[in-house]
UniProtKB/Swiss-Prot annotation:
Role of this protein: Cell wall formation. Adds enolpyruvyl to UDP-N-acetylglucosamine.
2-(S-cysteinyl)pyruvic acid O-phosphothioketal PTM positions: C116
Residues forming the catalytic site: C116 (proton donor)
HAMAP family linked to this entry: MurA
Compartments (UniProt record): Cytoplasm
UniProt keyword Cell wall biogenesis/degradation present: yes
Reaction catalysed by this enzyme: phosphoenolpyruvate + UDP-N-acetyl-alpha-D-glucosamine = UDP-N-acetyl-3-O-(1-carboxyvinyl)-alpha-D-glucosamine + phosphate
UniProt organism field: Syntrophus aciditrophicus (strain SB)
Binding positions (UDP-N-acetyl-alpha-D-glucosamine): R92, D304, V326
Name of the protein described by the UniProt record: UDP-N-acetylglucosamine 1-carboxyvinyltransferase
Gene that encodes it: murA
Amino acid sequence: MDKIVIEGGKPLRGEVKISGAKNAALPIMASALLTEGWNTFHNIPDLMDIRTTRKLLQSLGVVIEGTSGTIRLNAGEISNIEASYDLVKTMRASILVLGPLVARLGIARVSLPGGCAIGARPVNLHIKALQEMGAEVILKEGYVEARAKRLKGANLYFDMPTVGGTENIMMAAALADGVTLLKNAAREPEIVNLAEVLNGMGAKVSGAGTDVIRVEGVERLHPVEADIIPDRIEAGTYMIAAGVTGGDIRVLGCCLSHLDALIEKLIDAGMTIEPFDGGLRAAGTGTIRSVDITTLPHPGFPTDLQAQMMSMMAVAEGLSVMTETVFENRFMHVGELMRMGADIQIQGNSAIVKGVGALKGAPVMATDLRASASLVLAGLAARGTTELSRVYHLDRGYEELEKKFSALGAEIRRISE
């Protein structure tokens, strides 16, 4: 098993190119199931979750050319309607094949998903919506089985904004009979990207990016060529890296409008953020001010940047309160940060972070994707050597992480244990 070794304490400087967004690429790859013929998608990142999705779609009969960058998918002949546990167990986004399969073929059998162990993330919202669209859905032996001759348009309300649920039902509704309204829909940029792809296929989706999405079902969709948006979470991670190391990084290829909540907090913390054509400059000033964070669905502060921001607050001046409202059990990185000298107390769904000025390198263990990123940032800021184990979590969501940080001047390397 690999681990990452970091010699910290060096300001990071230079340029970093942001990869395509994993959380946009996964549903867009699944959307190919709605069509016959060759879909072409650009800016696909080379990540473990992408490779898992590739295997999953191929197991269903999808022909795929390419592994990253530009890939082509042809779902003209679906030979299997079951997404098996062996493929689904490592990645929750696997549930995204459920809606497209039921919509196009009238049947699907998908194993209950796995992925990061950061809370329940229930699929009941997906199931309830499909049932309201006329599908017969049962849970049997760890699988979701859904059947419908043709899904019917429906007036749907999500009890809470759900990114995966919004995406799944948007895709299902694209081939349904009639109009579907998704109320209290998630508003993330990745949902807007998916809606653009669906409309390119001939779907009639409006309102993506708001909390009410309207989908008028059509009889048939056609293949499309489309681009994946840049990864706002990767961009945010490198922006925070500039702050936590007192560095100066030009973040290329990011979309500023996707980063509003983070930018505001980084400026409050004393960083310099300067937009330019094609990206932004993020620079630390040497002194980090404490800021309070409350995670919220988009356009609020993203839960996927909470752990990284905590690493920065661990070396800030003063006291910060970080409140997690989106997922439960998302403070599993706290114990590892404390091994490096951080002063953090958990009170319910809040973490009270008292800045200590400097962290010390230590052996630490990743518990999930974003927690692992926070430990990398802490290691980059710390004095001495940090060894991060279980780095397969990082490989699920960060493309060429060591290479990109090395290009910014970090002493970081991967070794096999």
